[in-house]
Amino acid sequence: MSYSIVRVSKVKSGTNTTGIQKHVQRENNNYENEDIDHSKTYLNYDLVNANKQNFNNLIDEKIEQNYTGKRKIRTDAIKHIDGLITSDNDFFDNQTPEDTKQFFEYAKEFLEQEYGKDNLLYATVHMDEKTPHMHYGVVPITDDGRLSAKEVVGNKKALTAFQDRFNEHVKQRGYGLERGQSRQVTNAKHEQISQYKQKTEYHKQEYERESQKTDHIKQKNDKLMQEYQKSLNTLKKPINVPYEQETEKVGGLFSKEIQEAGNVVISQKDFNEFQKQIKAAQDISEDYEYIKSGRALDDKDKEIREKDDLLNKAVERIENADDNFNQLYENAKPLKENIEIALKLLKILLKELERVLGRNTFAERVNKLTEDEPKLNGLAGNLDKKMNPELYSEQEQQQEQQKNQKRDRGMHL
């Protein structure tokens, strides 16, 4: 049994939008996601745009065209909604590439009905990962022309209804897909959520470390600017130094003729001031040559690119961790169903065996077989409790008295 899967999330900044753009359009040089098969990337396609887009520019264009609200849009307003539509591998394994494209065309049709065709930014299908899926983006503009991600996305109840409508939409197109159950209904294991949170926390810490490096560079730059300004102030200080011409006697030991020696005599204090201004001039001259040559701009540009790459990789790791967790969660649903079927069959077999052997013989035999395996003994007891609840309700008080005893942890005779 396969499921229809649709998820949606708010994108809170232009930087995050750029990270999504690079992931969706495969613009990065390297990817942390090992599921990407680069030899198949050419099979990816977008059902909205013929060419690659700058998502932030496209969002601004959509808002300019479709926003009719009277209020000025806040700088921290959410302008981008990102989502994903897919199913499981069992579904796509039975689809040709043309069938798969038709499925996503129907999915795009649903998005246009929900959000409005003019508000759809992209609908990009990735065929180069383990499971085909479609990333979609929307500008959250309401029917009356306001920008409101809160109203367009809604709360958990609204999201549940959104998922219901999508499942009904694909069913009407002939796909026998069940609705993907929410985590609250399926009671996903706490361990899985903890692992996901650990991965997310790791990338968050990595991003914070890179931010600290950036702050350190900024502090260093501020310090250099202060030193530069100090040198500039020294250089601008007017020079007004009293001085004397050095003289010497000429014409022999007893001669009175005096002439200038060609040197100027100044005080030690004034000499030190000269030295400061000379050093300031040298420092500024070196900085000027560094800037004039273009090396300063090149170095700063390189530094910004490196930091931008690190930030994009951190964003991509978080997105991939989120995608991998959701895919793992959805793939586990069929396994859960199979386990439930197996348990149901086991109950039927045990009930029949109990009928053939009789209650006492059956219970003694099971307890004997599992007495050295506490977990198996406990499992057998739980199954028997579900099969014969009336026996346990009658002996509830007795169970409470014996619950800490080592023996009699299995079935009741």
Curated annotation (Swiss-Prot):
Keywords: DNA-binding, Plasmid
Highest taxon, organism lineage: Bacteria
Region (Disordered): 175-198, 374-413
Bias (Basic and acidic residues) ranges: 188-198, 403-413
CDD domains in UniProt: MobM_relaxase
Residues annotated as binding DNA: Y45, Y115
Record keyword DNA-binding present: yes
UniProt-listed InterPro entries: Mob_Pre
Annotated family: Belongs to the plasmid mobilization pre family.
Other facts: Contains conserved positively charged amino acids probably involved in the binding of the pre protein to the RSA site.
Name of protein: Plasmid recombination enzyme type 3
Origin species: Staphylococcus aureus
Gene behind the chain: pre
